[in-house]
């Protein structure tokens, strides 16, 4: 959850303690791209296997305010996604979604304009179309996504658009040119993400040194063009970070995130405490199964309570791989609580 994309101020968000305020929902593992750095395609479970309408009803009753139709595949491959979004809107839920942009078009975007869409993440990994398409292994993707960004701003002008940008060996030297894409199409935020679990695309020492030298320039350029970084701090290499994504700065992280969020994997029906735990050991991090339990039973169940306590006490090693957004949420929460 990125606080900059949430309408409610932190104080109001924190009043939802022990309610699933923000829910990540992965509809399937199917994708029209074949990204170089993605491990989702190795998963055996593919299509949605739970009743999404029933789930939306349960989440609404439990106090959910936001549903993020997220990755794990491309959400717009699912033929029913617009029906799900329509139902979320009727239930008063806010919607955020992630997409590579390939399956969107003007007709679908016009339809999206009638739903409670608050923010959209698009994935773009280079200011050059050929590099982006080669990393995503989907020819023509760059042209489609950039065109659809402008269409969304035309038909849903108040929506916040964030660009997920996986920093890697192929694009980190051109980060300034990527920021300048703001001059070509309309978006609000850049969300640079350091690549992990892909040694062949991890940075050289020289690239890291060069990035650090240009850090002030990146901030100045973004400010000049009216762009924000979703997480204010993009000084990724200040603390030691490995090609596996381990961050030594997180060793003492106390996590309250599962008291506000959860991740639901529709192909398996498995429920996890957050979006960072879905590829961890299921024996530790899985808190329920919607094929056997209701969402209320999962949320109020003993597994979530036990895991929540361990995370709050900083007992689990997932903290070293925690995404920056989730870290910032925790820092903000404990600062607010004093």
Positions of predicted regions on the chain:
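Residues within well-ordered alpha-helical secondary structure of globular protein domains
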Residues: 58-61, 87-90, 151, 181-184, ...
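Conserved alpha-helical substructure of the radical SAM core
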Residues: 1-119, 201, 207-211
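Radical SAM enzyme [4Fe-4S]-AdoMet core and its adjacent flexible, acidic
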Residues: 26, 47-50, 94, 114-267, ...
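Extracellular/mature segments of secreted proteins
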Residues: 263-266, 282, 326-337
């Amino acid at each position: 959850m990125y606080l900059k994309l949430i309408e409610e101020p932190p104080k109001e968000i924190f009043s939802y303690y022990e309610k699933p305020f923000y829910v990540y929902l992965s509809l399937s593992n199917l994708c029209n791209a074949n990204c170089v750095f993605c491990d989702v395609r190795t998963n055996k479970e593919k299509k949605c296997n739970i009743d999404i309408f029933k789930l939306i009803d349960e989440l609404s009753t439990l106090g959910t305010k936001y549903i993020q139709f997220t990755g794990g595949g491309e959400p717009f491959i699912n033929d029913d996604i617009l029906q799900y979004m329509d139902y979320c809107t009727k239930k008063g839920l806010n919607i955020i979604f992630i997409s590579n942009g390939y399956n969107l078009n003007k007709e679908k975007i016009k339809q999206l304009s009638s739903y409670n869409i608050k923010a959209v993440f698009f994935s773009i990994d280079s200011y050059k179309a050929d590099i982006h398409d080669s990393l995503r292994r989907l020819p023509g993707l760059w042209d489609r996504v950039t065109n659809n960004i402008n269409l969304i701003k035309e038909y849903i002008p108040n929506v916040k658009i964030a660009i997920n940008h996986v920093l890697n060996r192929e694009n980190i030297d051109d980060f300034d040119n990527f920021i300048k894409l703001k001059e070509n199409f309309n978006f609000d935020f850049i969300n640079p993400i350091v690549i992990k679990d892909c040694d062949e695309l991890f940075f050289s020492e020289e690239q890291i040194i060069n990035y650090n030298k240009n850090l002030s320039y990146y901030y100045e350029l973004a400010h000049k063009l009216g762009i924000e970084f979703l997480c204010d701090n993009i000084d990724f290499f200040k603390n030691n970070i490995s090609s596996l994504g381990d961050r030594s700065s997180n060793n003492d992280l106390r996590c309250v995130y599962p008291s506000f969020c959860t991740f639901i994997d529709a192909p398996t029906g498995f429920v996890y405490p957050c979006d960072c735990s879905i590829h961890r050991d299921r024996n530790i991090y899985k808190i329920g199964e919607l094929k056997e339990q209701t969402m209320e039973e999962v949320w109020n169940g003993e597994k979530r309570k036990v895991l929540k306590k361990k995370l709050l006490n900083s007992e689990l090693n997932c903290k070293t791989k925690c995404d920056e957004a989730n870290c910032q949420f925790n820092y903000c929460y404990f600062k607010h609580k004093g």
